Amino acid sequence: MKVFPATTAAVLICSHLAMAQAPEVWTFDRLDAIGGHPTTVLGSPRLIDTPLGKAVEFNGVDSALVVDVHPLAGAATFTWEAIFRPDGGEQAQRWLHLQETGTENRMLFELRNVDNQWYFDSFVYSGTSSKALIDPKRLHPQGAWYHVAAVYDGREFRNYVNGVQEGAAEIHFDPQRAGRTSVGVRMNLVNYFKGAIRIARFTRRALSPAEFLPLPTR
């Protein structure tokens, strides 16, 4: 049995904790894999060039990606971010859906379209708790790039568009177990998304807006 000096053990513990806290980044710069995870391609999503770099564009009809990973499984606190471009289409769209295997526990980024504008909907269902943060008065023009985020600190659930808080609620969410992610559609293949996604980031702690991904400037 190896015996490590106290300093070595401390370094190993700190390294393990740092790895556990490291965010998972999904850059949408290819179709066959995202964040190192293989994808199942549904319909005809397209890889496109944008001022922000490569992105995946979805047609709002039948295109989506499915990843056999729930990137926030086990997280008691979290920050979930994305940079995306909504391009109109159907009124209700579910564009990023994390689902625990074998249960109804899930986390969604959704949007609603109204007269060439959209508003954000962040939803979590976990254990005996569920909450949608949605404000129809918070309208944003379609066709531009946006940063959106949902943050849970173990007590309060908040959401943001371009770093500005739009909703908040005190609630308890149980950590979710392993599962899958659908991108561009709800997991049961309804409410397809029309637009493009550049990046998503999943962090296992509550970030402040100052720590968010940089806002899109083009």
Task: Say what each PLM segment does.
Residues 169-196:
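Flexible glycan-contacting loops in extracellular carbohydrate-active proteins
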